[in-house]
């Protein structure tokens, strides 16, 4: 289902617990709102047309601007204000995803192998020159 925006239209392709994927039709001169995502990355892949992506760095006076053309991709880290402007009408794809920490495990105990402890045994060298383990009866 397409949703109208001031700058064009967006169509949700997929949304699940790991990502969100949209096809956007952008109109020259259109500018999306300046916004941020607390936890999600935001990626832009341009199929046709041209897009300017602005990213306000944590030092609010520093603004990075990236022009993305056909076949090019850029991404914005979570927590940074950003905005796109359509320089030439076209089609782009917008992708949102969150990263998980590969080292997020907290261990309460250490793994182990259960074994029975044998305390009463004897090792003997037999007549065939091999060692054998004998349990002592007691």
What are these regions (language model features)?
Residues 36-38, 45-46, 86-89:
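Short glycine/proline-enriched turns and hinge-like loops at secondary-structure junctions
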Residues 1-34, 40:
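A short glycine-rich, His/Asp/Glu-containing loop-to-beta-strand
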Residues 21-25, 43, 65, 73-75:
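Conserved hydrophobic/aromatic beta-strand scaffold that supports enzyme active sites
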Residues 31-33, 71-83, 100-101:
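Histidine-centered metal-chelating micro-motifs
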Residues 33, 53-55, 94:
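Short hydrophobic/aromatic-rich beta-strand segments that constitute the beta-sheet cores
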Residues 39-58:
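Glycine- and acidic-residue-biased ligand/ion/polar-headgroup-sensing regions
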Residues 85-138:
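Double-stranded beta-helix
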Residues 57-79:
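Short acidic-glycine-tyrosine-enriched beta hairpin
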